[in-house]
């Protein structure tokens, strides 16, 4: 079997282990991987298969390290996130190497998934763009509801920071999303409009 197809199967099998299920029975992690890959295809129409696989690894086995295992404050969140970047990147690299993917490609995926070189590495930037667009398109309302105790300004600051991480092309894509008015208002506020 082709190493890329073998890697895809191994990655998706890891996603299937996610105990969180959607109403249709699919794992939440597999659904997220599909959304990430779809955004990569939209943002980078000639994306190499290895970049598409990297997109599928964005939250690889994230479920295995619950946010609740770290302090609830900002420092705890940042520590958790940094740990996940490295863990997910290493797991992705291991699965790719087991599948026969060349070491150089597996190392690229490691860099992209671990967020190395954001703003300077096109692969890392593409994954960050896709992750933020998936968040805006699919997750922001549930995030707002889950954190109803946050003041509006905190959401605006989150959006401002996220916007600053987007490439110009991804910013344009974000502006084309059919977002709820409350989200659009917060984005406008974040952008000073």
Feature-to-residue mapping (PLM):
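Amphipathic alpha-helix face/heptad-repeat signature
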Residues: 7, 51, 81-85, 126-129
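N-terminal, Lys/Arg- and Ser/Thr-rich interaction peptides
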Residues: 2-13
């Amino acid at each position: 079997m082709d190493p890329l197809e073998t890697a895809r199967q191994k990655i998706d099998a890891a996603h299937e282990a996610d105990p969180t299920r959607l109403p249709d029975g699919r794992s939440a992690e597999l659904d997220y991987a599909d959304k990430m890959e779809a955004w990569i295809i939209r943002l980078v129409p000639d994306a190499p298969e290895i970049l598409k696989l990297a997109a599928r690894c964005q939250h690889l086995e994230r479920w295995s390290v619950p946010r609740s295992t770290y302090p609830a404050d900002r420092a705890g969140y940042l520590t958790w996130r940094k740990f996940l970047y490295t863990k997910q990147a290493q797991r992705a690299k291991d699965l790719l190497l087991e599948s026969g993917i060349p070491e150089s490609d597996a190392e690229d995926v490691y860099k992209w998934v671990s967020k190395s070189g954001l703003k300077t590495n096109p692969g890392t930037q593409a994954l960050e763009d896709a992750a933020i667009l998936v968040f805006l398109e699919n997750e922001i309302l549930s995030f707002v509801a889950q954190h109803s105790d946050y003041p509006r300004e905190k959401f605006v600051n989150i959006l401002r920071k996220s916007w600053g991480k987007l490439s110009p092309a991804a910013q344009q894509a974000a502006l084309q999303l059919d977002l709820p008015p409350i989200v659009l208002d917060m984005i406008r506020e974040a952008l000073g409009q």
